[in-house]
Amino acid sequence: MTDLQNFVTNGFVLKKGLFSNKEIDKLNQYIAIRQDKEESARETTTSTGKLTMTMWNHPSEDLFGKFSTNERIVKPMEIFLNDEVYHYHSKIIWKNPGDGGFDWHQDYGYWYHNACLYPDMASCFIMLDKANKENGCLKVLRGSHRVGRISHARSDTPEQTADNERIRELEKRHESVYIEAEPGDALFFHANLLHSSDAVSYTHLTLPTNREV
């Protein structure tokens, strides 16, 4: 099955080694010295605990912009979406020991309310270190993008969550896949693909970076 067939059928494609260890090390070092990104980060809470993230819309000429507009991301996105693409926003998520994860949601569940009329959008999630079940890696419901947009709502947390009753039914029909990956791997996934992550269950520090194009 080709990457395009995987994207259409399953809603996601994991590209191994999209960026080299040297490139990821450089990006990690750059994040560590960018005080403005750390200062603009906000703490949020979900049903499983807290986590920290920062987000921005305009790709700059710095290293962040070079990653998010890199042809290794742009060209596959153009194939998957069958159109020219533009940068919508970038995000860094810090998950420290004991931090929580995200509840089941669709990215388009948020973007629909930002005047994005069609779900012709996708995300690219770049691993900045090893991602596994213990440190709260991303998990997806295979093929769930085909159900279309699901209603999202806030309960007692700041983050939106997809309708729980519908999620329970979809979990009976769609395989839950943990995206265990290495630094430099990148997950491309459709804006309607349901995804979540668990809380960090041990003391390893994880810095997954979510690049949404």
Residue ranges and their predicted role:
Residues 2-10, 15-116, 153:
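Non-heme Fe(II)-dependent double-stranded beta-helix
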Residues 89-92, 124-126, 205:
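A structural signal for short, well-ordered beta-strand segments
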Residues 106-108, 126-130, 142:
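Short, structured patches in soluble enzyme cores that scaffold and shape functional sites
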Residues 117-132:
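Short, conserved beta-strand element in jelly-roll/cupin
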Residues 133-194:
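Double-stranded beta-helix
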Residues 195-201:
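Short beta-strand His + acidic residue motifs that chelate non-heme Fe in jelly-roll/DSBH
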Residues 203-209:
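Conserved small/polar residues in nucleotide/adenosyl-binding loops
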